[in-house]
Amino acid sequence: ILQNCLVLRSFYRREKGGLIKKIKFNILSRIHKELLISVPFSKKGRLVGFCKDINLGYCSCHTVAFAAIQIAYSLKYARIICSGLDLTGSCSRFYDEDKNPMPSELTRDLFKILPFFRFMRENIEDINIYNLSDDTAIQYDIIPYMKISEIEEPCVYEKIS
């Protein structure tokens, strides 16, 4: 896993990349069907992706939430419920220390982050994901809103294969 995660680390470093990087990711996504990557051929286009198998690594997009979603999907959770997925930068981080809070870069990086979530919604048909945040930068057609009271409601799942 360490070797493969290093391969995907270059995915995070710079989403644009050169021709060789784009060819490399195109080949990787053809070899590994669980690694979904959109490789743009324009210079302005950004790489976006989603890895269905965490053993291959994960596609990073400037937020730990996207990595967590890929891990949950890879572990075949039938339903993924995100709490605190607002991406607005208006709240402090849950791990901040009162005297030394880390500045949030979400506002600056949002244009890089949202295409990954959109790509996930358009390409991962069997993902059953919800957002508990009623104030979020992620549109509800990408990750639907769920009230906390709805969590305990019974639901029928089909087995993810």
What are these regions (language model features)?
Residues 1-161:
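Metal-ion/cofactor- or nucleotide/acyl-coenzyme-handling active-site neighborhoods
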